[in-house]
């Protein structure tokens, strides 16, 4: 859950909104804290604490021998625990400087390729808090044209932070952008290759496209703790244009003009990292090249959720980049989904969904999105927990958030029944034990279904729905995209990302973030030493379409390829609206007759297809020749039933039975949110009350938390 992170961001934002002071001598400032920490066994304690936490990571063993993709090594093969132990052994021989230590340990964590793992240093006192304060911006921002050529403009971030900042060769850079003189190299490397490598050691995403996006955004501006580049990497760099001119330029650093720095505690995910920049700088970092086109949306919630019925183009449109609710109106996002769904249901227009830099959020909102976009399907998510050190306790800690059930059964399983139904699996020479995957029922979502918030009002054909994804689509966004994909409920279209990438994964990291580390000693030890609320996910999602008895690969390690890719290589902004509409029209027309022969999930709905079972409906699948096979195949059911894909039959929806203690479960969402907020604020208060002390007593912290 990332709701409380957003709350902290907003609170801290309003506390302090002063201007930033430019730092031209970045290396000199970093050198201030590039010294050994004098606390006895500091580095060893940090590593031991991190090992204790990582022992609970869902994929800690699988990463030693991850599944292959199309016979090749697509995922990192790493032994994180051993790498941490190796780092500790080198520390015993030579005491590192703090910055070098932070670089080393950050690379090890990043090798997991999992952004759900939170491990962030914010510092306790000068000079080490500089790592949490310093923002670094390149002098240029990158725009990739449809023909894949690159333009470079002066970085708008710099002037929003301080409009008096001096950028070397700024006049030439600005004029070349206006005259459309294209950039060919950065530091002597092809621009694309440079962006692939920039900050790559610290990028925790799996797909190449998402890494490219992450690096490209970071190139525009990043926090030093997020991307601790070497001194050589932070020196002046060169840019070369197509006419042969090479200019030297420089990074600019910024520090907030306040002791109450509101940046060091904030960016805990890519989504929050990007959105908080919008908060500070008022408009996106990657600004649009043209601002003439103004889109009037029927509803626009903080530029996170926007939808409209475009009568001119006869298309329904929804844009989204977050599944996080507004802290002041946590149920408002559900009402907005309902509003959009109601408007879309009143016409027969096709629908496009634009996912842009979506870092996820609440899983139940992802499920609502699934039903809003494709209401022929009934969302079901299969989850498992890996049997690691504390995962059973995590289940008990989260028992009020969800329940587990077997297929088609009305009685929920006890935690012991779920946890002790064990599956043993081998990955190479690695054996893991986990619980057998079951359907996870989000209690709040079930109450929403019961109230028929998204009752089926019309039947949208899968070929009349396009999901535009930049490939970064992360966490609960990935759950949304994967479930629609496996149902065959929409055409997946890729944009943005690496223009030269051959493989385009539609989404990534649909991890079941089941964790509560506050009872683990290592968690407290890390907070005492300046690290911000570490998080280690312990659950895994499994695909819903296959026989669960034969499916043993977590969705974390599967790749879902897009159906089409368009030549839009920048993040979505409203000036690109008409481009997306134009591309959608072409694709909708194409899929009336043609299809992607590599996607055997996508369905072509044909209402003339009839089946012996009265509630069953279907259509066609794509043939190997890239046209629709005219053989009728069932894939959906009447409302109040859900489609069972293995037996190809309709199962009546039944309300999940609950214990008497669950009578107030429809309010679980609000209570969970409120509880998380209180706990986080208490931890913050406890931490800052004690941060200036050299020693923090672990038992005292636990007692204070329990009393509160």
What is each PLM-predicted segment?
Residues 600-603, 614-630, 641-648:
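Extracellular, cysteine-rich, disulfide-stabilized repeat modules with beta-strand cores
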Residues 18-410, 466-467, 506-515, 582-585, ...:
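Flexible, low-complexity junctional segments that flank or bridge functional domains
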Residues 362-578:
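Conserved acidic, small-residue-rich alpha-beta core segments centered on
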Residues 654-673:
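Extracellular juxtamembrane-to-transmembrane boundary of type I single-pass membrane glycoproteins
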Residues 2-19:
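Cleavable N-terminal signal peptides of Sec/SRP-targeted secreted and luminal proteins
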Residues 205, 597, 611, 624, ...:
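Disulfide-rich extracellular modules and peptides
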Residues 673-690:
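Single-pass type I membrane-protein transmembrane alpha-helix
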Residues 685-705:
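Membrane-proximal cytoplasmic juxtamembrane segment of single-pass cell-surface glycoproteins
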């Amino acid at each position: 859950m990332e709701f409380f992170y957003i709350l902290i961001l907003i609170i801290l934002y309003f506390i302090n909104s002063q201007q930033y002071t430019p730092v031209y001598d970045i290396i000199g400032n970093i050198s201030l804290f590039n010294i050994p920490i004098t606390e006895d066994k500091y580095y060893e304690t940090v590593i031991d604490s991190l090992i204790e936490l990582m022992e609970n990571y869902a994929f800690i063993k699988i990463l030693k021998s991850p599944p292959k993709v199309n016979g090749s090594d697509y995922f990192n093969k790493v032994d994180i625990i051993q790498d941490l132990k190796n780092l500790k052994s080198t520390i015993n021989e030579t005491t590192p400087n703090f910055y070098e230590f932070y670089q080393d340990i950050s690379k090890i964590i990043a090798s997991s390729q999992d952004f759900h793992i939170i491990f962030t240093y914010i510092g306790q006192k000068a000079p080490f808090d500089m790592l949490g304060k310093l923002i670094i911006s390149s002098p240029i921002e990158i725009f990739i044209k449809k023909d894949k050529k690159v333009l470079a403009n002066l970085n708008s971030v710099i002037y929003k932070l301080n409009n008096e900042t001096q950028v070397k060769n700024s006049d030439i850079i600005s004029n070349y952008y206006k005259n459309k003189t294209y950039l060919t190299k950065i530091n002597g490397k092809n621009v694309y290759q440079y962006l692939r490598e920039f900050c790559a050691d610290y990028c925790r995403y799996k797909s190449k496209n998402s890494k490219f996006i992450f690096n490209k955004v970071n190139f525009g501006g990043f926090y030093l703790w997020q991307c601790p580049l070497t001194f050589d990497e932070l020196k002046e760099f060169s840019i070369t244009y197509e006419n042969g001119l090479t200019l030297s330029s420089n990074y600019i650093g910024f520090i907030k003009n306040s002791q109450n720095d509101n940046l060091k505690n904030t960016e805990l995910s890519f989504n929050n990292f990007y959105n908080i920049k919008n908060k500070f700088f008022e408009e996106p970092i990657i600004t649009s090249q043209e601002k003439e086109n103004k889109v009037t949306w029927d509803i626009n919630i903080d530029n996170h959720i926007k939808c409209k019925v475009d009568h001119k183009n006869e298309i329904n449109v929804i844009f989204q980049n977050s599944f996080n609710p507004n802290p002041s109106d946590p149920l408002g996002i559900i009402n907005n989904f309902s509003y959009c769904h109601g408007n879309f249901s009143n016409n027969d227009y096709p629908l496009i969904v634009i996912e842009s830099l979506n870092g996820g959020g609440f899983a139940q909102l992802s499920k609502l999105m699934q039903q809003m976009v494709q209401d022929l399907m009934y969302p079901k998510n299969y989850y498992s927990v890996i049997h690691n050190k504390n995962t059973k306790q995590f289940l008990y800690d989260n028992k009020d958030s969800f329940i587990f059930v077997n297929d088609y059964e009305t009685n929920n399983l006890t935690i012991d029944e779920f946890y002790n139904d064990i599956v043993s699996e081998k990955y190479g020479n690695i054996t893991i034990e986990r619980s057998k995957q079951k359907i996870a029922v989000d209690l709040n979502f079930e109450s929403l279904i019961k109230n028929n918030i998204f009752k089926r009002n019309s039947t949208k054909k899968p070929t009349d729905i396009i999901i535009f994804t930049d490939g970064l689509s992360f966490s609960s966004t990935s759950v949304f995209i994967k479930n629609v994909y496996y149902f065959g409920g929409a055409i997946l279209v890729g944009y943005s990302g690496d223009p030269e990438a051959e493989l385009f994964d539609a989404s990534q990291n649909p991890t079941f973030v089941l964790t509560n580390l506050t009872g683990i000693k290592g968690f407290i030890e890390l907070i005492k030493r300046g690290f911000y609320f570490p998080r280690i996910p312990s659950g895994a999602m499994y695909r819903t379409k296959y026989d669960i008895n034969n499916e043993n690969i977590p969705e974390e390690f599967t790749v879902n390829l897009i159906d089409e890719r368009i030549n839009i290589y920048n993040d979505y902004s409203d000036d690109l609206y008409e481009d997306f509409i134009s591309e959608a029209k072409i694709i909708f027309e194409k899929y009336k007759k043609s299809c992607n022969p590599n996607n055997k999930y996508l369905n072509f709905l044909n209402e003339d297809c009839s089946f012996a079972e009265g509630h069953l409906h279907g259509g066609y699948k794509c043939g190997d020749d890239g046209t629709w096979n005219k053989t009728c195949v069932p894939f959906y059911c009447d409302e109040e039933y859900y489609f069972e894909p293995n037996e190809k039959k309709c199962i009546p929806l039944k309300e999940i039975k609950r214990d008497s203690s669950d009578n107030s479960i429809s309010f679980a969402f609000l209570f969970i949110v409120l509880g998380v907020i209180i706990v986080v604020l208490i931890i913050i208060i406890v931490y800052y009350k004690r941060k200036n002390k050299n020693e923090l007593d672990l038992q005292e912290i636990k007692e204070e938390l329990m009393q509160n």
